[in-house]
From Swiss-Prot:
UniProt subunit comment: Monomer.
EC class: isomerase
Annotated family: Belongs to the helicase family. UvrD subfamily.
Disulphide linkage map: none
Cofactor: Mg(2+)
UniProt keyword Ion transport present: no
UvrD-like helicase C-terminal domain ranges (all copies): 314-610
TM segment ranges: none
Gene from which this protein is expressed: uvrD
InterPro entries from the UniProt entry: DExx_box_DNA_helicase_dom_sf, DNA_helicase_UvrD-like_C, DNA_helicase_UvrD/REP, P-loop_NTPase, UvrD-like_ATP-bd
Listed name of the protein: ATP-dependent DNA helicase UvrD1
The species this protein was found in: Mycobacterium leprae (strain TN)
Length: 778
């Protein structure tokens, strides 16, 4: 492969790349040689540093753009990185410089190396979570499994966990032993069948994209060497969020510890950026030890700390520093800014979640009405998706425009998934999940029995579902009645006709699918208002397809005008395959409204990672909510919850609101929650409490509440001598005035001498006498 280098720029241009950087940022940009770990605190300018480092490689060190691989965690971050680099060095990087997510990077490698994986070719489909679950549903039914006990969701999560650890189906079976439980045995069996059907469908799931790429690099040294020679500079953003498979992928691409290397080529330059204090995706398989142990894995590492914050005021940063400092074993790091203290954090204790939502709505109205901000300056963050309901119930009648990020996505709607399934079948006829989805959509007289017969025929003859349909159309499957055969023959002819149009403009192809399949006609003939909304969504997809075709053509023309060589590591799969790939790799963060959208953003704390807003409301500061109830007994999980609180606080630029509800509905019942232990960790002088005592409606004196509004109802807290004897049992949920929320583990004794061992999370496991402890049963 030819390597295209860029002539070094004059010193003045190089100096421009370093303008405005603080000493630590400058050191990170110009570093050469040894692996580089940039520990970048929230808002410390890591994106600026990464973009400047890439530009510096090109302009000052004459590194060819094709020798650079930059990996991000979201499409949005990748697009921003490309734009920043283009502004710094000119828009001549073309397709040769890879700036993309882990999954997109691996797709590009796999498209070119698919022939090395048995049963796969370069136009493979990418199964998302719903596709995987649909396939697992089929497998479960065919294997006669109890779907309630072994649900597709459970099986998908278990298989995903194995793949993230690079454990293949054969190894999962080999690892079984005599004392292995039924679930693990079932997972191993289903895993093998799942992989077999994926190959038959010429498909990979999300986890396969990483795992199969690692497999190729490890099994074929010459391929690994090819990519190591190409990518002499590898940069990885958000390294604290990598899982084991991604960790191994990076090592293979760089060449550290490479096995079977054909020669002694030195490893590539590796630069990773991350912050262990913002590691919040353990539930997705991320491994915080990847960044914590980086200096051990790469002994000659240079480590640079970025602690100067360019986003938030000092009051906000001081609150964040105080919370995260309680995590044990972390790298000492304190964020600071020279932007001044700023306004105090606003605290609010509400009676319930509806009062909390009304307070937030009133504050937003006041700020917008006063001309201080616009709606798109505001984000409301919460620990769990269900907390958006009360906000929406208040925002709608109030007239506050909003968008829920991570809620129901455009690409998850039935009509869009139906149309995408048609397109996927045209691109990859072996995609059985998509084929079976559209077989009778819209209704064309192919019932469940006919579909089952086709499936059985495919299984018995060892052919794909598509080949089985063709056999039916040719009259080779006698078990079907004439009506079903005719309907299936018509469906096969429809696909053949549409397949002749795949080289048309993508927007025109989508229109052809809608019209010729009868899908559009069925919706237009309906009087259901919901069907009209589906039409609007389909019109939007048609527009997007036209735009995508135009963008593809413009990009090709630009590359040609700049004489940018085509990237030989990326085969031209055509506009349809590129479009399907883009849709498949969409993530929640791609739904985030633009800055000028004119809407308030509602999202979970997890989804807010990497974002910032002038005004941020973080709701639900209660033990049981933040931290979440299920984490209270596990110090490791509680540490991650504290990191989540830290992430929420550091999203705010100028104004930060922290609110909690005294009672919050759960399963239709009001639940009394104490204030979050994290809230108690913020210095009181940083918070301006707009409301911190109970309303008269609770009939509780003000002296019965702490500065955070902790409830001490007279009916419960009127003194041990006057209250009913507390009766507890293992598993009961309690709150203690000092230790917060906990769960009862053991109870000994009876009556007034009863003693409970209670797990209070980070406060420890404590024995308390029922008759004297300030404990309330929830």
């Amino acid at each position: 492969m030819s390597v295209h280098t860029t002539d070094a720029k004059p010193d003045s241009e190089v100096d421009r790349l370093l303008d405005g950087l603080n000493p630590q940022q400058r050191q990170a940009v110009v570093h050469e040689g040894s692996p580089l770990l940039i520990v970048a605190g929230a808002g410390s300018g890591k994106t600026t540093v990464l973009a400047r480092r890439i530009a510096y490689l090109i302009a000052a060190r004459s590194v060819g753009v094709s020798q650079i691989l930059a990996i991000t965690f979201t499409n949005k971050a990748a697009a921003e990185m490309r734009e920043r680099v283009a502004r710094l060095v000119g828009d001549h990087t073309g397709p040769s410089m890879w700036v993309s997510t882990f999954h997109s990077t691996c797709v590009r490698i796999l498209r070119n190396q698919a022939s090395l994986i048995g049963g796969l070719n370069s136009n493979f489909s990418i199964y998302d979570v719903d596709d995987s679950r649909s396939l697992l549903q089929m497998i479960g039914q065919d294997m006669g499994l109890d779907i309630k006990r072994y649900s597709p969701r459970l099986m998908a999560n278990a298989i995903s966990n194995l793949k993230n650890e690079l454990i293949d189906a054969e190894s999962a079976v080999a690892n079984l032993s005599s004392d292995t439980d039924d679930l693990a045995r079932t997972v191993a069996t289903v895993y093998g069948e799942y992989q077999r059907r994926l190959r038959t469908a010429n498909a990979l799931d999300f986890d396969d994209l990483i795992g199969e790429t690692v497999g190729i690099l490890q099994a074929f040294p010459q391929i690994a060497e090819h990519y190591r020679r190409r990518f002499r500079h590898v940069l990885v953003d958000e390294y604290q969020d990598t899982n084991h498979a991604q960790y191994v992928l990076v090592r293979e691409l760089v060449g550290h510890g490479a096995r079977n290397s054909p020669d002694d080529m030195p490893p590539g330059e590796l630069c990773v950026v991350g912050d262990a204090d913002q590691s919040i995706y353990a539930f997705r398989g991320s491994t915080i030890s990847n960044i914590e142990d980086f200096e051990r894995d790469y002994p000659d590492t240079t480590t640079i700390l970025l602690e100067q914050n360019y986003r938030s005021t000092q009051n906000i940063l001081s609150a964040a520093n105080s919370v995260i400092a309680r995590n044990f074993g972390r790298r000492d790091k304190r964020l600071w800014t020279d932007a001044g203290k700023g306004e105090l954090i606003v605290g609010y204790v509400s009676d319930n979640e509806h009062d909390e939502a009304k307070f937030i709505a009133d504050e937003i109205d006041a700020l917008v009405g006063g001309g201080e901000i616009t709606y798109d300056d505001v984000a409301v963050l919460y620990r769990a998706n269900n907390l958006s309901r009360s906000l929406e119930e208040v925002f709608i009648p109030t007239g506050i425009p909003y968008k829920v990020v991570g809620g129901f996505c455009f690409y998850e709607s039935k009509e869009i998934r139906d149309l995408i399934a048609y397109l996927r079948v045209l691109d990859n006829p072996g995609d059985a999940v998509s084929m079976r989805r559209i077989l009778n959509t819209p209704r064309r007289g192919i019932g469940d029995r006919a579909e089952a017969c086709v499936s059985v025929y495919a299984e018995n003859t060892g052919t794909s579902f598509a080949d089985a349909l063709q056999a039916v159309a040719e009259g080779k499957v006698p078990m079907l009645n004439t009506r079903s055969v005719k309907a299936i023959a018509g469906f096969v002819a429809l696909l053949d006709d549409l397949r002749c149009r795949v080289d048309d403009d993508l927007g025109e192809l989508v229109e052809s699918v809608l019209e010729r399949s009868g899908y559009l006609r069925e919706l237009e003939s309906s009087t259901d208002p919901q069907e009209l909304a589906r039409l609007d969504n389909l019109n939007e997809l048609v527009s997007f397809a036209h735009e995508f075709s135009t963008e593809q053509a413009n990009a090709a023309a630009l590359a040609k005008s700049l004489h940018t060589p085509e990237d030989e590591d990326v085969p031209d799969t055509g506009a349809l395959a590129a479009f399907l790939e883009k849709v498949s790799l969409m993530s929640d963060t791609d739904q985030i409204p633009e800055n000028n959208s004119g809407v308030v953003t509602l999202m979970t704390l997890h989804a807010a990672k990497g974002l910032e807003f002038p005004v941020v409301f973080v709701t639900g500061w209660e033990d049981g909510m933040l931290p979440h109830m299920r984490t209270l007994g596990d110090p490791t999980e509680l540490s991650e919850e504290r990191r989540l609180a830290y992430v929420g606080i550091t999203r705010a630029r100028q104004r930060l609101y922290l609110s909690r509800a005294i009672t919050r509905s759960s399963w239709g019942q009001p639940i009394l929650n104490p204030e979050s232990r994290f809230l108690r960790e913020i210095p009181p002088e940083l918070i301006d409490w707009r409301r911190s005592i109970l309303t008269d409606s609770y009939s509780t004196p003000a002296s019965g509440a702490s500065r955070f509004g902790r409830v001490r109802p007279s009916s419960i807290r009127s003194g041990a001598s006057k209250r009913a004897l507390l009766v507890l049992a293992p598993g009961d949920r309690v709150t203690h005035d000092k230790y917060g929320l906990g769960r009862v583990e053991e109870v000994s004794g009876v009556g007034e001498s009863a003693i409970s061992l209670i797990d209070f999370g980070s406060s420890g496991r404590i024995k308390l006498m029922h008759n004297h402890a300030p404990v309330t049963k929830l």
